[in-house]
Amino acid sequence: MPSISGQSSQHLAAKLLAHLCGFAPENLIDQLTSACTRFAEACADLTLGYDLLRRLDEQPNLAGQLSKCWIVSEFSLDHHCRDVKAFLSLIDSGDLHRSYYPLDDSLDQPLEKFLALNSDPSSSADNFSSVYQEQLHNKIDTELGGEKVGCEEVGDKVEEKLLPLLRCYRQREMQRIIWRDLNRLSNMQETTLDLSLLAGSCVDEALTVIHAHMAEQYGQPIGAES
């Protein structure tokens, strides 16, 4: 493993470019070179950068997809550089290549699913967003579940703990959605559905947490004047 130095960072950038340049148009090689250099310099622990190289070797389709993502999406490159560990974790999770809500090419299928849910008294539209809601609920429960705060502290706790947690989760899932969209791993219906359900789940789970803390302080409203 190369030592952690400026030269090693340059070596990492060169190795990344060698893996990715074959998938980039000639007129965009300079942009890809800049992206590889930026990522390598962002790796405070260069071991993480070489971990990415290992994944590129192990997963044949990953290099072409990463090349496109770094060239087209500044958002993705920013976040991959900002938190390399989180990016590697996202790759390892398999979620980049997994559809949460598989859809066919029928334009009316998502609408039909929603209509079916809404017309069935035993069903709820929430079931359709259960993947995001379950993931986010588990994350909130793990990181905030043991905390008890009074009403006067809710604002501070939301600012201090809940909002960063929601932001982190939302950014992870946005990286996944962008990756799948740019690489045509999802169609337009799935992409727009993912965006809608992600937004709705973040709002719903945030309200659930705040409601629980408020109810603990004031009690649960049960009528028009209570």
How should each PLM-predicted stretch be described?
Residues 1-226:
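Non-catalytic regulatory/linker segments of enzymes
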